[in-house]
């Protein structure tokens, strides 16, 4: 056990009190002046103390186990309290508390200074003297005679002696669980390494008990901090988080006590003789060390020596180093934590402004560099991150026309988040097409009155020349083929001739043989044979003729409808009464289904009443259409770190009596861990066999016990809220304008009705999108910093390793402390590896922070751009990176909707001043109408393919409305109804076709509705013919004939000029010759 070199200087004075059970007062070394700094009146003992069950005192004490005295007061150790109450070392025999170590001269407990802090926790009320370890020492507090400590423990107050709640008599309160021992000194270099490793484990601790631990820019007020530590005899203690301990036994004569059975402790001389001559009896370990006598002498005549039951001396393994410290324990200290200045939230960006450039905007931030920004123009968006004060952000090419509202949302490098709005005037109509013989030229010939005909004729000539060239090439290939085939034909002819000649000779030989035979037999005959002449027909020359037809084919006819949808309310539940000032007050109830429109457009519900020329509109303007996460059950995930610890005890020491105890289960705790970890925390315990014998520091050769525990903790208190997405459904941002003019913005998610506003509730019915890989995604939010991410995760109740959500907690508080009654986990997340005398662990926990940093918002996943959303339906919104169509509609329920309609017909006249924009596009054409109205009213414009409604003010005003067309040249009559007054207006103008937008880096487009037929339609041949020749089949035919005749005439003219030029050149050469 403890090697106490000053044992011989101790003098035990036995004071008999009621027999052998009286306390023993042992005087310390005479030269020691302990306790001089704290007078007895402050509750501290004088130069004597009482020590219980310590091997360096007396063997007599070992024979009186009924003694219950504690160190520190004349009344014995029963007057000493410990905090926390479950401290374990205070109950162990053979271990020194700091009180004992102070009395023995191993350390010094000093009187507390004014700057020393009293840790909160235990109740101090009453006449109490208390001590606690500090970061650089051990201090004590006390009050003088007639005073008692206040409940907060901060000061002493007068004690009447009869106050209720005061602790009786004098008491000592020891804060912490500490065991002290003679240490093995370590060099300064080792101490610095331990200190550095400790600082890496506690990077957010600034000061401990007023002593600087880490340099911090900002720090909190001191607060209680429970931590394990060891005192290695240097300037301050080493605080530890993950460490291991083992208890070693070292055989020494000081580890045995000798006594006579029934008599008492042996005298000093007898004990010395037993340990040197082996003349006594003893247990196995004593006999192994000192030797024993095996006579039959009566037991009371001989001393018997036995090993003191003790855990041994503690060796701490920390940071890869093994240290035998002076003291090892777990206690409460006062620490300050690092405080980072709060990040500036969304606000104004001083010095930020927009500049409009071709195809995008330039964002200038004068105060700080731009970290990231998202800029939306109409339903096109683009994001960028530059790190500069001037950043150009481009949109889809050809996507922006006319006056466009710009919405900017971003963050600066200094942490400032900002939002602001602006507008830009982009080229409109034919002004947006500024190139010759390019794609835009081909798609919009109406913008080039003269160049288009020249281009068409050139194309026809080039086509004709290409056909001629192709025919000549084919002719040349035919001639070349005849040259190649002729030698082959000649070779076959020669072979055929040779075969005929050979066949003829063979025939003649056979005839000659027959003739000889006939002559020999005397028969004469003649044999006549006609020769057959075979004549090969010569192939005739084939003449090649050239045919160059020109064919134009109309493949399909494109159709288009309106973009701003209008539905006329058809409700039979309408009641009206006469109001004041020629007004009729009506109340209506019903339901209507409006086709959903694209961002930036409006759907109108048109209300009229019998007998009233006036009408009103309920308008739904769509600002954005995104995808939102339809959340399933959410849970909380701690920023968990794996921890493990182990303690090795030799056989028959402490809990290791006959090996691993059967009662030590997965939820058991070793005495070494008492107070050092939360028993309600999430963890797993176990016990395994370790090495034994002298080589492992054990008296017993049987395997020792390695008690180990693995657990998880949240050292920084970081919590993530994880919301798995059951589906990604469309969500709209709409602006609802009531017939009365009141406006309210809603964020309806598909299938979820909005709150009732003035009797109206809107339900957005959007179809689901089939996008692969999104069902496993989850919204991940860090609750403190509000950091957002989108990543795969586990569903609630499932803990698949490798995904976020391996540890799931039901509440924010349970995630902060990781309580086992509020969290679930897979114990295999923390692996344990047993070694000779300790255990090490390894972690399989997926780092939520690493995943969140990798997939932080904004991000692009599966062809969708995800960004932060500030509405109540979801924190993240997704937008496809390509033109994605969904089907949708708005269900409008109105109950008790009030309408104020005028009974007087308005005098309203007007004209269309300009038609510009695009056809077969999302935004539609912009129609400028100048109206003169005698009163405020509602105007309704109905054209062949579209209609719209808008509010009209009294007097002369200009209005710009959107109408959709499917042809480039607009020339038609539209009906205008303004406050009951019917008239006609003429629309004339040229529209352009905007190509399907091309994407630039970082750009994307919000979702649009396929039920609105103006969504990026590719023009058909009819659109092109309309733009080229005008509307109508007769114009197309005349235009095509004119182009062909013009091309043919130009061809003949060019041929004539070429021939004329050739003749002139030939004549010039003839004259020169």
Curated annotation (Swiss-Prot):
| Glycosylated residue positions | 33, 63, 853, 914, 936
The record ties this protein, via InterPro entries, to: Phlebo_G2_C (IPR043603), Phlebovirus_G1 (IPR010826), Phlebovirus_G2_fusion (IPR009878)
Q: Which residues make up the annotated site Important for glycoprotein C and glycoprotein N subcellular location?
A: 1071
Q: Which residues lie on this side of the membrane: Cytoplasmic?
A: 475-535, 1058-1073
User: Positions of the region Golgi retention signal?
Assistant: 475-521
Q: Which domain of life is it from?
A: Viruses
UniProt-listed Pfam families: Phlebo_G2_C, Phlebovirus_G1, Phlebovirus_G2
Region (Fusion loop), start-end ranges: 650-656, 691-705
Q: Which UniProt keywords apply?
A: Disulfide bond, Fusion of virus membrane with host endosomal membrane, Fusion of virus membrane with host membrane, Glycoprotein, Host endoplasmic reticulum, Host Golgi apparatus, Host membrane, Host-virus interaction, Lipoprotein, Membrane, Palmitate, Signal, Transmembrane, Transmembrane helix, Viral attachment to host cell, Viral attachment to host entry receptor, Viral penetration into host cytoplasm, Virion, Virus entry into host cell
Could you mention a single GO BP entry for this protein? fusion of virus membrane with host endosome membrane
Which Cys pairs does UniProt list as disulfide-bonded? Answer: 26-49, 143-156, 180-327, 206-216, 258-305, 287-292, 349-352, 356-424, 376-381, 563-604, 576-586, 629-725, 644-841, 650-698, 656-705, 660-687, 691-696, 778-793, 809-823, 908-978, 918-921, 943-974
A GO cellular component entry from the record: host cell Golgi membrane
| Residue intervals passing through the bilayer | 454-474, 1037-1057
Positions of the UniProt region annotated as Internal signal sequence for glycoprotein C: 536-562
Give the residue range of the signal peptide. 1-19
State which ranges are Lumenal (membrane side): 20-453, 563-1036
Note the site residues: Cleavage. 562-563
Q: Which family does the record claim for this protein?
A: Belongs to the phlebovirus envelope glycoprotein family.
Q: What protein name applies here?
A: Envelopment polyprotein
Q: Which organism is it from?
A: SFTS phlebovirus (isolate SFTSV/Human/China/HB29/2010) (Severe fever with thrombocytopenia virus)
